[in-house]
């Protein structure tokens, strides 16, 4: 399961960011169809750099980095 801060690869073929890697900004637990918000480095034609995806449209590439202990 993806979590905030994970690096994910996009598997949705009609997406501008298909096969690109982005960072998970948030995951909604309320039961909506596209609960995962992913932020990308590059922008699409409209100047947008985030999009919502379903969990089955994502593959986790890298787990989030652990926060350093104080």
Curated annotation (Swiss-Prot):
It is found in: Cellular thylakoid membrane. Signal peptide: none annotated. GO terms for biological process: photosynthesis. GO terms for cellular component: photosystem I reaction center; plasma membrane-derived thylakoid membrane. It is a peripheral membrane protein. Keywords: Membrane, Photosynthesis, Photosystem I, Thylakoid. InterPro entries: Elect_transpt_acc-like_dom_sf, PSI_PsaE. It comes from the Bacteria. The keyword Membrane applies. Stabilizes the interaction between PsaC and the PSI core, assists the docking of the ferredoxin to PSI and interacts with ferredoxin-NADP oxidoreductase. Belongs to the PsaE family. PANTHER family: PHOTOSYSTEM I REACTION CENTER SUBUNIT IV A, CHLOROPLASTIC-RELATED, PHOTOSYSTEM I SUBUNIT IV. This is Photosystem I reaction center subunit IV. It comes from Nostoc sp. (strain PCC 8009).
């Amino acid at each position: 399961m993806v979590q905030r801060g994970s690096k994910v690869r996009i598997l949705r073929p009609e997406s501008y960011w298909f096969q690109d890697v982005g960072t998970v900004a948030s995951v909604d637990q309320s039961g909506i169809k596209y609960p995962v918000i992913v932020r990308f480095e590059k922008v699409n034609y409209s100047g947008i750099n985030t999009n919502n995806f379903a969990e089955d449209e994502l593959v986790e590439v890298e787990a989030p980095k652990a926060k350093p202990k104080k």
